[in-house]
Amino acid sequence: MTNIRKQHPLAKMINHSFIDLPAPSNISSWWNFGSLLGLCLMIQIITGLFLAMHYSSDTSTAFSSVTHICRDVNYGWIIRYLHANGASMFFICLFTHIGRGLYYGSFTFLETWNIGIILLFTVMATAFMGYVLPWGQMSFWGATVITNLLSAIPYMGTGLVEWIWGGFSVDKATLTRFFAFHFILPFIIAALAMIHLLFLHETGSNNPSGISSDSDKIPFHPYYTIKDLLGAILLLLSLFSLVLFSPDLLGDPDNYIPANPLNTPPHIKPEWYFLFAYAILRSIPNKLGGVLALVSSILILALIPYLHTAKQRSMMFRPLSQCLYWMLVADLFTLTWIGGQPVENPFITIGQTASIIYFLIVLILMPLTNLLENKLLKW
């Protein structure tokens, strides 16, 4: 058995990635989220495949086909809610994974970090297009509002929006192409995740201390396979609790109303995992400025490695940076809350303040605090 594992070309690859992989002996539970993201992706692909068997991507039947899945298909309701809430779990793991990378300085692995940013954008695009498919009120108006943002691009904006729509409004052509893209993108995400892992295994994992762990490595199996299994059980427990007890907790009631282009919902808002970016978008009165701020709020991650002025890699021994980090987390929670509120005072002011604080912490305060800590440590 050992010989097959170490000699067969395919088994050898799996062995080097998941069995005999040398891993740092001190990585904490924050390192579980990479494998949990893999699990989430598998859940989404499997449930999505079964949903696609019964879904109809036509404007006249899309809403009815989702209703049919929930009412008439065997266990269709659980497949549908696993898929919808699986997306929420996916983003919880994704944000935690990025947060871990920021806290412990994993962004110094440049290729891995940059592939991760591409993955984030791809997952966000996939989730957005998936939200349009049930063709409820929020699906239709969410698609209209978000795609319309591209019209802010000078000269070519309007043409670009109509090209994406496949007409002069969000209609049958839009729904059909969104379904096609929503189906193919998860497989592209899986391929990107493999490239992400490939680059990670070139350098080896980071660890909480941020210093090289070459002198103290342990095999991935059985130590971290068991640890990842525990994480997977807890994730599945949370997901099934959500699906079986309150499946609509994170959804919008407006999406149970079939799409009607003649009736605008009072508050158009995306799913909760996009609310922080939506709040930043709304906090700027100018359309182009808002779109630039929205893109910058995520693209700013690409600047993090270049803004890292600290001599120490991890924040583990840097209390001032830790304070700023948790302020940033609190700020993102505030933005998420504001994104779901109506556009009126005091929410407008809170949103604008939180948006300024977000960019201020990342672009100015963090690098300055790093330099101050270097000085305090006489480095």
From Swiss-Prot:
Swiss-Prot/TrEMBL GO biological process terms: mitochondrial electron transport, ubiquinol to cytochrome c
Chain residues that bind a ubiquinone: H201
Keywords: Electron transport, Heme, Iron, Membrane, Metal-binding, Mitochondrion, Mitochondrion inner membrane, Respiratory chain, Transmembrane, Transmembrane helix, Transport, Ubiquinone
Residues at which heme b b566 binds: H97, H196
Cofactor note: Binds 2 heme b groups non-covalently.
Any one cellular-component term (Gene Ontology): respiratory chain complex III
Matches recorded under InterPro entries: Cyt_b/b6_C, Cyt_b/b6_C_sf, Cyt_b/b6_N, Cytb/b6-like_sf, Cytochrome_b, Cytochrome_b_C_euk/bac, Cytochrome_b_N_euk/bac, Di-haem_cyt_TM
Main location: mitochondrion
Domain of life, source organism: Eukaryota
Binding site for heme b b562: H83, H182
Membrane topology: Multi-pass membrane protein
Cofactor(s) listed: heme b
Subcellular location: Mitochondrion inner membrane
PROSITE patterns noted in UniProt: CYTB_CTER, CYTB_NTER
Transmembrane segments: 33-53, 77-98, 113-133, 178-198, 226-246, 288-308, 320-340, 347-367
One Gene Ontology molecular-function label: metal ion binding
Family: Belongs to the cytochrome b family.
UniProt subunit comment: The cytochrome bc1 complex contains 11 subunits: 3 respiratory subunits (MT-CYB, CYC1 and UQCRFS1), 2 core proteins (UQCRC1 and UQCRC2) and 6 low-molecular weight proteins (UQCRH/QCR6, UQCRB/QCR7, UQCRQ/QCR8, UQCR10/QCR9, UQCR11/QCR10 and a cleavage product of UQCRFS1). This cytochrome bc1 complex then forms a dimer.
Biological role: Component of the ubiquinol-cytochrome c reductase complex (complex III or cytochrome b-c1 complex) that is part of the mitochondrial respiratory chain. The b-c1 complex mediates electron transfer from ubiquinol to cytochrome c. Contributes to the generation of a proton gradient across the mitochondrial membrane that is then used for ATP synthesis.
Additional note from the record: Heme 1 (or BL or b562) is low-potential and absorbs at about 562 nm, and heme 2 (or BH or b566) is high-potential and absorbs at about 566 nm.
Protein name as it appears in the record: Cytochrome b
UniProt organism field: Galago moholi
Gene name as annotated: MT-CYB
